[in-house]
């Protein structure tokens, strides 16, 4: 099982629990090259389409930015997993999410907040990194470890500079934008680093969070589109 497979398997129960029952129509934005949750959604009886410029080929995917996607049916649920923190225009993207959903439709968001990744949390993750597989691209934690070491800067400054250069939105900004457009139903901070650590489980990361050794960097959120007034 790849790290991406582990991540999808770990998050899928939350996603499924928050969505309306099948056969609801679900759109996943930012499904990536592997197709995200679309296969699991289909297996669970949902009508599902994944949207991403790098999506797989096939009838269940659209290779386009979600801001320009025209769903084939009214959308009962939208899933956005690690898709919002790097959009070019956050307000425009969130407005589009709201417009995609039918009134009363469900939005499920899985994200991370870079501003909560303090030095202690980063070092905890770095210490648990395995060497990259031969021929494989280094993971995101590997890249941060090497770039931070090469920068010679304090961790907080390095991370702020990276986020600014990459246009990564703070988790608090994403959350505020969501709450301004949707009726929040659920929000919690969750483990996130395990997604890049082959030998560390979500439960082990949660134990370190509970012990106060590290901070929870992940975010899980669910909300509904408010019914129109009147």
Task: Go through each PLM region and give its residues.
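A conserved beta-strand element that flanks and buttresses the S-adenosyl-L-methionine
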Residues: 79
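C-terminal lobe and adjacent flexible extensions of AdoMet/dcAdoMet transferase-like proteins
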Residues: 181-230
């Amino acid at each position: 099982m790849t790290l991406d497979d582990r991540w999808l398997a770990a998050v899928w129960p939350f996603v499924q629990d928050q969505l309306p029952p099948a056969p609801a129509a679900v759109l996943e934005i930012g499904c990536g090259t592997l197709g995200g949750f679309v296969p699991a959604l289909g297996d669970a009886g949902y009508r599902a389409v994944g949207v991403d410029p790098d999506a797989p080929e096939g009838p269940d995917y659209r290779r386009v930015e979600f801001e320009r996607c025209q769903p084939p049916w009214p959308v009962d649920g939208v899933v956005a997993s690690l898709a919002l923190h790097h959009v070019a225009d956050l307000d425009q993207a969130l407005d589009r999410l709201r417009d995609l959903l039918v009134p009363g439709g469900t939005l499920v968001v899985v994200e991370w907040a870079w501003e909560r990744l303090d030095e202690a949390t980063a070092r905890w993750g770095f210490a648990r990194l395995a060497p990259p597989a031969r021929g494989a691209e280094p993971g995101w934690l590997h890249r941060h470890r090497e770039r931070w070491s090469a920068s010679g800067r304090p961790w907080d400054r390095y991370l702020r500079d990276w986020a600014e250069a990459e246009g990564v939105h703070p988790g608090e900004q994403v959350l505020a934008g969501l709450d301004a457009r949707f009726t929040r139903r659920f929000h919690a901070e969750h483990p996130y680093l395990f997604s890049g650590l082959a030998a560390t489980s979500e439960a082990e990361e949660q134990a370190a969070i509970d012990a106060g050794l590290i901070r929870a960097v992940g975010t899980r959120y669910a909300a509904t589109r408010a019914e129109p007034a009147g």
